Amino acid sequence: MRATQLYAASFRPGFDSPPQLVPVALRGSAPDTTTVASAGELAVGTTDPCPAPVAQIGVADVYVPAPTSPEPEGLPQVAPVFSRGNVPDTTAVPAAAGTTVGVADPYLPPGVGHLSGFAVPSHGIVPTVPGVLAGGPPTAPVAPRNSAPVLRPEWPYHVPSVSDLDWFDAVPAGVPGGDEHNYNFLIAAPQVPRLADEHEMVDVFDIQAVRADFPILQETVNGKPLIWFDNAATTQKPQVVIDRLSYFYAHENSNIHRAAHELAARATDAYEEARETARRFIGAAKAQEIIFVRGTTEAINLVAYAWGGKHLQPGDEVVITHLEHHANIVPWQLLSSQTGAILKVAPVDDAGNLLMSEFEDLLGPRTKLVAATQVSNALGTVTQGEKIVELGHRYGARVLIDGAQSIPHLPINVSELGADFFVFSGHKIYGPTGIGVLYGCEDVLTEMPPWQGGGNMIVDVTLERSLYQGPPNKFEAGTGNIADAVGLGEALRYVERVGVQRIASHEQALLDYATPRLADIPGVRLVGTATEKASVLSFVLAGHEPLEVGKALNAEGIAVRAGHHCAQPVLRRLGLEATVRPSFAFYNTYEEIDVFINVVRRIAEGGTNIG
């Protein structure tokens, strides 16, 4: 790519204003960072996984404007959650811990000078799910990526010998005990052999037993066995998730957090246990940092309007990448039009790699937020999440990582990642639709105002003013999606039991198997060939519209996505309006890929009716 082709689109206020092209500074011309301590060095001596961004020091031309928002309110941090049979005592409220808040605080009711009359406990009960989850939660640590011994791809998946495939890493996590569910994938796992180098090997799940946990995979479409290659759009649900939802409605259905009756306590237990499961799954420090939302889109909008609406001023900058889903573009465009902030876009190369040097060139003293995907939904590109966070913090910005496509494929630890916000959707990781998670550092969430008002998120309401709870309840106004939050918790426990590293290894092997075979078909152009990818294999076929190819595959029982995948900017960057996008999950097989490849080859040769 010529240097003149590298650019960043700068979006200024106004829906009718066209994007302006802002030249990216040449490499080496960014502010001098040689005297700036790294994020790791700055964090020495502290256990805070979310240190506040530190503005660049030692550079004369860096200006970080003083905050224009009022100081954070000292709000209670956790909503009361009462165990079964206990009625909340409304006559003797415990005193608020910490510093009191003055009468000027806008969150306080008239005439109230401090929070002591409205305090809530600093922690709730230890959640349980009555009669269902008797055992302790899985606590096996997630091994670092690329830290495990390797296995030959021929075993245990019976992959045909292919000269162009390398060995792949398989790092199955240990299966913790204590869970009474009878998971099919744990039955009759094969004995693991040893390689000649005497690396210690670990057990690998039986793919057919895994598939037995997903009832929809027994479906037929057009008389053919269903092959579900549309996993980047949504994943299928294991029977334990379906059963957990049914159990909730049959035995626990109630509103939560308030009431003296048994079912309310059961529902609260289940809901808060799901929050704790989500916390553990992504490595957050506290359950208060987990906010349930409808999905990734709502999570990003929450950050845009609650955090961005408070902190962004005219001329401030938000930096995203060219890889983003529309859900990580449109909210920032709307916010920019309302606040006068400027939206900048980091470019990608022709393979779909994010150009990190050009990304850093966009950062500066006016950068207030970086919002970037960890895995591209359209191309499968895996970005350098930790590097993005480090650079954003170096320039004093908050960082949001879109984990919608990374959460089902990669080990996630937000404490190690260091992002201020991390968002994902439940339906992308074998959970129900309509539920997702916003993770935010506790200090950041505490100083953010609510973005919706209603019940459940308040401590006290008068006709003049309202006093809000702390996170997470402050951001969960009204009756939430209780049942699907419980279902998400069950889905995450299921993935923990399978093993995130097992899943990553198997999916990478599927991608390595499918990629050269698809590329070998005459007329196929692979779209997105980044150095590091997750299990997305977008392509176009010469002489055939993507929708036609999708319909022809459907006739053979194969479900793929055909279109722009809510990522029009990056497809247009590559000269396309649409692609065919097969995407793999850990329940897919090599045999399914063989069927898919044969059908695409027949389409290319004109042997399949695509009308």
From Swiss-Prot:
E.C. code: 2.8.1.7
Keyword line: Encapsulin nanocompartment, Pyridoxal phosphate, Transferase
GO biological process, one term: cysteine metabolic process
Chief localisation class: other
Residue numbers carrying N6-(pyridoxal phosphate)lysine: 428
Superkingdom of this protein's organism: Bacteria
Catalysed reaction equations from the record: (sulfur carrier)-H + L-cysteine = (sulfur carrier)-SH + L-alanine
Cofactor(s) in the UniProt record: pyridoxal 5'-phosphate
Region (Cargo-loading domain): 1-208
Subunit structure: There are 1-2 copies of this protein in each type 2A encapsulin shell.
Family of the protein in this entry: Belongs to the class-V pyridoxal-phosphate-dependent aminotransferase family. Csd subfamily.
Role description: Cargo protein of a type 2A encapsulin nanocompartment involved in sulfur metabolism. Cysteine desulfurases mobilize the sulfur from L-cysteine to yield L-alanine, an essential step in sulfur metabolism for biosynthesis of a variety of sulfur-containing biomolecules.
Name of protein: Probable cysteine desulfurase 1
Source species of the chain: Mycobacterium leprae (strain TN)
Lineage, broadest ranks: Bacteria, Bacillati, Actinomycetota, Actinomycetes, Mycobacteriales
Underlying gene: cyd
